[in-house]
Amino acid sequence: MSCVVQTTEEEAIAKTIQVYVDGGISGRSDDMKHAFHKDATISGYVGPDLLSGPIQHLYDWNNGNGPATSLQSRITNIDVYETIATARIELDNWTGRKFTDMFTLLKIDGQWKIMSKVFYMHAE
């Protein structure tokens, strides 16, 4: 029984992550906002500079870069425990760059929300 529950939760988390990816493809942050909690944060390096703060940084970056119609994504790991989860995703060709994202998620009112996104921008 726990395997079935786990699979269902993993599928729900994958759907949340897909909302994020779809927003990257469209280049419209309004399309991805439903994946994130309103108080979510983002952290990672852009070149030598640390970007860290509210998720609005991601929304601004996404809107500024526009559609990433060639974006490819692959979830490599989801780990769930009751109402908390972590996930790792590989993203190729987001504005010509490759990213590795790590998410922490929390199940709130029956829905999985990304609370934190930590990213690695691969060297060109």
Residue ranges and their predicted role:
Residues 36, 91-93, 118-119:
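Short beta-strand segments enriched in hydrophobic/aromatic residues
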Residues 1-30, 34-38:
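Short, low-complexity N-terminal intrinsically disordered segments enriched in polar/charged residues
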Residues 40-41, 123:
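Short secondary-structure capping/turn micro-motifs that flank functional sites
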Residues 8-12, 41-98:
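Surface-exposed, charged secondary-structure patches
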Residues 28, 35, 46-48, 102, ...:
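Residue-level detector of alpha-helical recognition elements and their boundaries
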Residues 98-124:
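Short beta-strand edge/turn micro-motifs at domain boundaries
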